[in-house]
Protein backbone atom coordinates (compact mmCIF):
# COMPACT_ATOMS: atom_id res chain seq x y z
CA UNK A 1 0.00 0.00 0.00
CA UNK A 2 2.95 2.34 0.57
CA UNK A 3 4.61 1.59 -2.76
CA UNK A 4 6.12 4.33 -4.87
CA UNK A 5 4.82 4.28 -8.45
CA UNK A 6 6.06 7.45 -10.13
CA UNK A 7 8.74 10.03 -9.50
CA UNK A 8 9.09 13.06 -11.79
CA UNK A 9 12.27 15.11 -11.65
CA UNK A 10 12.03 18.47 -13.42
CA UNK A 11 15.12 20.55 -14.13
CA UNK A 12 14.64 24.28 -14.59
CA UNK A 13 16.82 27.04 -15.97
CA UNK A 14 16.42 30.78 -16.44
CA UNK A 15 17.27 33.43 -18.98
CA UNK A 16 17.93 36.94 -17.73
CA UNK A 17 15.67 39.56 -19.26
CA UNK A 18 15.79 43.34 -18.87
CA UNK A 19 14.81 45.23 -15.71
CA UNK A 20 15.76 42.43 -13.32
CA UNK A 21 13.27 39.97 -14.83
CA UNK A 22 13.86 36.31 -15.66
CA UNK A 23 12.33 33.78 -18.04
CA UNK A 24 12.09 30.49 -16.16
CA UNK A 25 12.01 27.41 -18.37
CA UNK A 26 11.67 23.66 -17.99
CA UNK A 27 14.70 22.01 -19.64
CA UNK A 28 14.37 18.35 -18.59
CA UNK A 29 11.63 16.07 -17.35
CA UNK A 30 12.82 12.67 -16.11
CA UNK A 31 10.04 10.26 -15.15
CA UNK A 32 10.79 7.14 -13.12
CA UNK A 33 7.89 4.66 -13.36
CA UNK A 34 8.11 2.06 -10.61
CA UNK A 35 6.52 -1.36 -10.75
CA UNK A 36 5.47 -1.42 -7.09
CA UNK A 37 9.00 -2.19 -5.90
CA UNK A 38 12.47 -0.76 -6.55
CA UNK A 39 12.49 -1.65 -10.26
CA UNK A 40 11.60 1.18 -12.60
CA UNK A 41 11.33 2.06 -16.30
CA UNK A 42 12.35 5.59 -17.06
CA UNK A 43 11.62 8.17 -19.76
CA UNK A 44 13.11 11.56 -20.49
CA UNK A 45 11.96 14.69 -22.30
CA UNK A 46 14.22 17.70 -22.94
CA UNK A 47 13.17 21.15 -24.11
CA UNK A 48 14.88 24.05 -25.93
CA UNK A 49 13.49 27.58 -26.22
CA UNK A 50 13.94 30.67 -28.41
CA UNK A 51 15.72 33.33 -26.38
CA UNK A 52 13.81 36.28 -27.88
CA UNK A 53 10.28 34.94 -27.38
CA UNK A 54 10.48 32.07 -24.91
CA UNK A 55 8.74 29.82 -27.43
CA UNK A 56 9.64 26.15 -27.31
CA UNK A 57 11.62 25.35 -30.47
CA UNK A 58 12.54 21.74 -29.82
CA UNK A 59 11.23 18.91 -27.67
CA UNK A 60 13.14 15.64 -27.57
CA UNK A 61 11.41 12.54 -26.26
CA UNK A 62 14.34 10.26 -25.50
CA UNK A 63 12.08 7.26 -24.98
CA UNK A 64 13.43 4.76 -22.50
CA UNK A 65 16.46 5.84 -20.49
CA UNK A 66 18.15 4.62 -17.33
CA UNK A 67 17.49 7.25 -14.67
CA UNK A 68 18.34 7.73 -11.03
CA UNK A 69 16.54 9.45 -8.18
CA UNK A 70 19.22 12.17 -8.27
CA UNK A 71 18.12 13.13 -11.79
CA UNK A 72 20.99 11.67 -13.79
CA UNK A 73 20.27 9.46 -16.78
CA UNK A 74 21.74 7.68 -19.78
CA UNK A 75 20.03 6.84 -23.06
CA UNK A 76 19.45 3.12 -23.55
CA UNK A 77 18.21 2.72 -27.07
CA UNK A 78 17.09 4.02 -30.40
CA UNK A 79 13.59 5.23 -29.53
CA UNK A 80 14.24 8.98 -29.58
CA UNK A 81 11.76 11.34 -31.26
CA UNK A 82 12.48 15.03 -31.88
CA UNK A 83 9.75 17.61 -32.43
CA UNK A 84 10.69 21.02 -33.81
CA UNK A 85 8.41 24.04 -33.68
CA UNK A 86 8.24 27.09 -35.96
CA UNK A 87 6.02 30.08 -35.26
CA UNK A 88 3.94 32.60 -37.17
CA UNK A 89 5.00 36.09 -36.19
CA UNK A 90 3.97 39.68 -36.67
CA UNK A 91 6.03 42.42 -35.08
CA UNK A 92 3.35 44.90 -36.23
CA UNK A 93 0.73 43.18 -34.07
CA UNK A 94 3.12 41.77 -31.42
CA UNK A 95 2.13 38.18 -32.19
CA UNK A 96 4.95 35.70 -31.57
CA UNK A 97 3.57 32.50 -30.05
CA UNK A 98 1.29 30.93 -32.67
CA UNK A 99 2.74 27.71 -34.10
CA UNK A 100 3.16 27.58 -37.88
CA UNK A 101 4.77 24.14 -38.15
CA UNK A 102 5.39 21.16 -35.88
CA UNK A 103 7.59 18.40 -37.27
CA UNK A 104 8.46 15.13 -35.53
CA UNK A 105 11.38 12.98 -36.66
CA UNK A 106 12.59 9.61 -35.42
CA UNK A 107 16.06 8.63 -34.21
CA UNK A 108 17.26 8.37 -37.84
CA UNK A 109 15.88 11.78 -38.85
CA UNK A 110 12.89 10.40 -40.79
CA UNK A 111 9.75 12.51 -40.66
CA UNK A 112 6.97 10.68 -38.81
CA UNK A 113 4.51 13.55 -38.27
CA UNK A 114 4.04 17.13 -39.42
CA UNK A 115 1.35 19.75 -38.98
CA UNK A 116 1.25 23.16 -40.66
CA UNK A 117 -0.86 26.03 -39.33
CA UNK A 118 -2.12 28.98 -41.39
CA UNK A 119 -3.67 32.11 -39.91
CA UNK A 120 -5.98 34.78 -41.32
CA UNK A 121 -5.91 33.19 -44.84
CA UNK A 122 -2.24 34.20 -45.13
CA UNK A 123 0.81 32.18 -46.16
CA UNK A 124 2.50 29.95 -43.61
CA UNK A 125 4.41 31.94 -40.99
CA UNK A 126 2.31 35.10 -41.40
CA UNK A 127 -0.38 36.35 -39.03
CA UNK A 128 -2.44 39.51 -38.43
CA UNK A 129 -5.30 38.50 -36.09
CA UNK A 130 -4.50 34.95 -35.07
CA UNK A 131 -7.54 33.16 -36.52
CA UNK A 132 -6.48 29.63 -37.49
CA UNK A 133 -7.91 29.33 -41.01
CA UNK A 134 -6.19 26.15 -42.16
CA UNK A 135 -4.33 23.23 -40.64
CA UNK A 136 -2.54 20.66 -42.77
CA UNK A 137 -1.53 17.25 -41.41
CA UNK A 138 1.10 15.19 -43.21
CA UNK A 139 0.03 11.76 -44.48
CA UNK A 140 3.00 10.60 -46.58
CA UNK A 141 5.44 11.86 -49.21
CA UNK A 142 3.92 15.19 -50.34
CA UNK A 143 0.35 14.29 -49.31
CA UNK A 144 -1.44 16.32 -46.63
CA UNK A 145 -5.01 16.41 -45.37
CA UNK A 146 -6.42 19.69 -44.14
CA UNK A 147 -9.04 21.33 -41.97
CA UNK A 148 -10.21 24.83 -42.88
CA UNK A 149 -12.16 27.46 -40.93
CA UNK A 150 -13.75 30.80 -41.72
CA UNK A 151 -14.52 33.51 -39.18
CA UNK A 152 -16.90 36.41 -38.78
CA UNK A 153 -15.81 39.96 -37.93
CA UNK A 154 -15.88 39.07 -34.20
CA UNK A 155 -13.41 36.23 -34.66
CA UNK A 156 -16.02 33.49 -34.19
CA UNK A 157 -15.85 30.36 -36.35
CA UNK A 158 -18.58 30.47 -39.04
CA UNK A 159 -17.69 27.37 -41.07
CA UNK A 160 -15.36 24.45 -40.60
CA UNK A 161 -14.39 22.00 -43.35
CA UNK A 162 -13.04 18.69 -42.06
CA UNK A 163 -10.46 16.40 -43.66
CA UNK A 164 -13.22 14.66 -45.66
CA UNK A 165 -14.41 17.99 -47.13
CA UNK A 166 -17.57 17.97 -45.00
CA UNK A 167 -18.56 21.48 -43.93
CA UNK A 168 -20.14 22.41 -40.62
CA UNK A 169 -21.80 25.82 -40.36
CA UNK A 170 -22.07 27.64 -37.04
CA UNK A 171 -24.66 30.29 -36.19
CA UNK A 172 -24.67 32.46 -33.09
CA UNK A 173 -27.50 34.18 -31.23
Language-model-detected regions and their locations in the chain:
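Non-catalytic interaction/targeting regions
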Residues: 1-173
Amino acid sequence: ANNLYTTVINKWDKDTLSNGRFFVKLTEKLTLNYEGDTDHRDTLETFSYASGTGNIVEKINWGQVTGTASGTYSDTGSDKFTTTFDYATSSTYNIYALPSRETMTDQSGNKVRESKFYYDTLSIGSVTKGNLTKQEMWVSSSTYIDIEKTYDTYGLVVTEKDARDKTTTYTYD
